[in-house]
């Protein structure tokens, strides 16, 4: 079974999940069939937890740690004394095995890569690569970027510019182990570490070298560079694997170690950074105000109030809600790096790091196991999530109203027959009037007495034609209800007086004319052919009348251009106007009468009031006289 240390907080969503906090150690962890989830034991309870919230703890040398004190107790020989002398009085039990542990870790975990292409750093935390350089790989920071050491410098470099070498041979590992023993176990270079390692058999063989180093005092001869290199890489590796279990160094140290160790501690402290996910405006003086994407130096997570962290931003210290930010490492505080070369394409896509801070801002709905695929996408550890989730509820844009579908307008109906208005009531009666015209052509021309001398015999002809065509008109009267007749009614609407109809005098007729008109027009043409004869017979009379009364002749010509239908419409219109004028006059006269009556009534009321006022004055004067008499009588008595 493997143990894991928690790097990010996680709140359990289901009963079979564990609630974990940063720094806790989960025991007896095993992988599950479901990708992205592990199962382990914490505080006596076993459950599931996401694998990207924890980090594996290498426990390869732990079994030997328990045997270490037993060996030292049993030995009781010069070797234990040499260990005490080499550390100048420091307890050797807790310090001595670490160089061996580091050597063993190098043997099992050491990764190296060779530079294939030159690379110039674009940021301060990047390494400069030259073809042929060998880099000690520490960890994979994010997809396409690794962290490693080159020439005593720790930094980032693109993974697609290097090629990973195979693990070093055992001989090389042992040589590295022996080299590390000399500087690290000498009198001036003990280095404590959080983990406990064991002292294997080769360690006891290397002890005489320590004695020689103490005796001659020149243990750093030709090894100063190796000391710095080995110390930097090993300490950085320890920092990566056992970061939460940092212990304070015991005893005095050499100047060289004191210079390097604070640097490592500083790097560890510098990892306490967090990136803001959402903008926040402080409501109190001790709160920070920040925008999205800013980097806050995390000072403390323990502020005495749950859900609040203490940090520093732009030189100001204050508290801020932890669900508005996500913790990142120092190497990621400059993320994103747009100028870096694109990382090579890899199979599994990185998944967003669903930390507890993000979960508080927008809780995950992981009730369904299908949605746990969000956790299955592992982020590049310990980088911040590359795809930040949606922000908390923002004043929205909305939210989002449903767009109503476009109104479907009904099909435009055909234009109906206009209802007969009072002034245009004749339009609806054209068919009836037309039949009346045929039956009563004599009555309408008689309205104008000046028209009779012009056509003295046409009256009899029209009456004759009307009598002959009456039966035909009655038979075809039912055809008027057709659609053609409706259109015909609109086409033959009465025109203005003084305008001649094109169908009457030009010889043409509308194709939509009713059967009555088609029968009537030829007969009228026949009557028109007879009119010249009538004019010749009464030429003298017509000339005299035209000379004597030129105005009447113009009236006759105007009346000749009007059809009986138009004459009737004109007469009715004139009658309507006259009636309306008469009604208005009657109303005005009635109003005047009413006003006069009101004036009379008002005058009568005023007279009554005046009389009453005079009477009241007289009564008052009488009362005053009587009161005066009474006063005199009272005074005299």
UniProtKB/Swiss-Prot annotation:
Residues 166-177, 356-379, 437-449, 517-539 have a biased composition (Basic and acidic residues). The modification Phosphothreonine is found at residue 563. It is found in: Cytoplasm, Cytoskeleton; Cell projection, Ruffle; Cell junction. Residues 578-636 form a coiled coil. Expressed in podocytes (at protein level). The keyword Repeat applies. A motif (SH3-binding) lies at residues 336-352, 378-397, 410-422. Potential homodimerization is mediated by the coiled coil domain. This is CD2-associated protein. It comes from Mus musculus.
